[in-house]
Swiss-Prot record:
Component of the mitochondrial ribosome small subunit (28S) which comprises a 12S rRNA and about 30 distinct proteins. GO terms for molecular function: structural constituent of ribosome. The gene is Mrps16. Keywords: Mitochondrion, Ribonucleoprotein, Ribosomal protein, Transit peptide. One of its GO terms (cellular component) is mitochondrial inner membrane. It comes from Mus musculus (Mouse). Coiled coil: none annotated. It is found in: Mitochondrion. This is Small ribosomal subunit protein bS16m.
């Protein structure tokens, strides 16, 4: 019996395996497959294994859907596969890895911006109330 994992885990000449997103879907309706592929292959080209899927457009409940096969992702990382930046972020949000530093920074910026908008809106409402009282 032949073990396929040893065949797939062998060194790939001229590159390495990468876990990345492969674009699918239609115009204005993207859909991504999470795949293990050689880094020299095109983005939507041949891949070794599909590890999940990602739908970036929110559904009717406002959710972006992600399906991951964490056992196989763990296997390919153990075989030396690299991760693309978007995959690092997705796996950080799923709890598989620690959060990517840019995700934390972006969340802090968004929180400050929203707090500033709320403060400006309340100040504007107060100034309008004072103007109506003065009139």
């Amino acid at each position: 019996m032949v073990q396929l994992t040893t065949i797939f885990c062998k060194a790939y000449h001229g590159g390495h395996l990468t876990i990345r997103l492969a674009l699918g879907g239609c115009t204005n309706r993207p859909f991504y497959r999470i795949v293990a592929a050689h880094n020299k292959c095109p983005r939507d080209g041949r891949f070794v294994e599909q590890l999940g899927s990602y739908d970036p457009l929110p559904n009717s409940h406002g959710e972006k859907l992600v399906a991951l096969n964490l056992d196989r992702i763990r296997h390919w990382i153990g075989c030396g596969a690299h991760l693309s930046k978007p995959m690092e972020k997705l796996l950080g949000l799923s709890g598989f890895f620690p959060l990517h530093p840019m995700m934390i920074t972006n969340a802090e910026r968004l929180r400050r911006r929203r707090a500033r908008e709320v403060l400006l809106a309340s100040q504007k409402a107060e100034s309008e109330a004072k103007e109506t009282e003065a009139s």
